[in-house]
Amino acid sequence: NVSEVKVAGLEHVNPEHVLATIDIDTDKPVSNEQAAEAARDIWAEGDFQSVPFRFEPGPNGTEVLVFEPEEKTVGYSRLMFGGNVQSDFQSSNTFNVVLSHTWGWLNKWGGEWRNEIQLGEVKRFLSEFHQPLGVGGRWFLMPRVSYQWEPFDLYVGDSDTPVGEFRTETFEAGMFLGYEFPRLGRISAGAGWYDSRIKTETFITDLKYTEDSSFVSLRANFDTLDDASFPRRGFYFDGSVTYDFNPQGSIGEPDSNTRYEVKAAIPLQLGERTTALVSGRAAAASEVGNYNMGGVFNLSGSPYGRYSGDRLAFGRVMIYHDVSRTMRELRMPIYLGGTFEIGRVWNGTITEVIGDQGTPWRKAASLYIASDTWLGPMYLVAGRTFGESSSLTFYWGRLLW
């Protein structure tokens, strides 16, 4: 019989947090399999390299179960580098570089500060502090501030040459209260303030639009996919609904005070080595918001950002077949696949200046070869937006929606 469960050897992580993770009833006999399962649960929290355990003699003929997790040798201040590159080998070439820093275990309750900077086609800054409310607590507070700068072009009809270049700038700050579901996801609710602007880069006239408001927001994120790039199991859901109390700006009263964005994906196994990833996205921004569509797997065959508007609907079926067994000499996963995509963006503040160019549904398809390399996934994609354009595009990085 086990009389006590202990956690030993920790320097940074709070032992009480680990104990709160362990689901073992010491009133009943504890088997080696139960202890091993508890060790796996501790490891799955992501704080340790390994979680060895042992049984030691206890009082009155009992035993003491001792977990001795091995803290990460790199510590809990992590710096990560990423990004993406997209090129059609002609006029459409974009890149983004992402640098993120996470500083964990800043206090006994497991406070974590995350900062992210992105440079390139889209410029972005994010800073948030995740503070659990208690040792091993699932409730948390999270102050958050973000800024994003994103360009978009204005096209007329079927022309591939933009008649104007613009950018959106959005600043947002808020405080959120949420609940964490272990190894599943989180939900949160909060309030804050945002400021959004559209500015002209090049156009026949200098157009400027602004909007700002306080808001309340409900957000949810769940992710059980077994792989970030080529999943076979699990699901992904990310959604938010935001109500703006009193939007003020240069456009006048908005059509709606509600903003939302929903993204979802689920892989379906079609065979031992073949998977269909079904995904979709729907969104409505503020009157001074903007979504871009065009580029790899986002109406393939069209230039990056070919279509824009403040309303978006998009669906995609992405099939990939693992051919690594027939190409073992490359020593990395190789996939052959194809996609079918359908989407539309509409109701753009700028496009309405010359008439909405983004209303029709557009369909696209692609064939591609991909590899999940140690530098990240790489794709060579032959795409076609039906009735519009075609392209051969190289893409490196995690897929964007």
Labelled PLM ranges:
Residues 1-25, 183-186:
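Acidic, glycine-rich low-complexity/disordered segments
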Residues 11, 60, 271, 371-375:
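A generic beta-sheet turn/junction motif
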Residues 8-16, 25-36, 92, 120:
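Soluble non-cytosolic domains of exported or imported proteins
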Residues 78-88, 204-206, 213-342, 346-348, ...:
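C-terminal outer-membrane beta-barrel translocator/porin domains of Gram-negative envelope proteins
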Residues 3-8, 23-29, 85-88, 113-116, ...:
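Second-shell loop/turn segments in exported
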Residues 8, 21-27, 38-45, 104:
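Structured segments of extracytoplasmic/periplasmic soluble domains
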